[in-house]
Amino acid sequence: FITSAEYKWRRSNGLVMLLPHGYEGQGPEHSSARIERFLEACANDNIQLANCTTPANYFHVLRRQVKRNFRKPLINMSPKSLLRHKLCVSTFKEMATGSDFHRLLWDDAEFRPEVTNIKLCSDNKINHILNFN
């Protein structure tokens, strides 16, 4: 119903699901969501799949869900460790009027010509990289 209701039955819904995922050392019985299954079900803008890694982005994606003039299911995949990670913080300014949802978050590092690789990360991988550096 979640992915096909609009196409099959012309029924829209604004269901919001927060599905924590990732093993994070706990084993497969602790992983409650499979991103790849939802990605396979995405077709013709039938659902919104998000992976909000900051409180501000989570706020904006929920606000956007309520304020839009149409309804689509929103599935937010978030690793459990990000719910309490010390680097996963936002200011009120990032949630204030004039701020918006960011599809991508980027590092504000300076451009260096010797850089030959760029890494795109999701989930809490960026926190591992920042801790490594």
Which residues are covered by each model-predicted region?
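Gly/His-enriched, cation/cofactor- and phosphate-binding structural elements
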Residues: 133
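Active-site phosphate/pyrophosphate-binding segments
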Residues: 11, 24-130
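Short internal beta-strands
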Residues: 16-19
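Histidine-anchored nucleotide/phosphate-binding helix
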Residues: 1-7
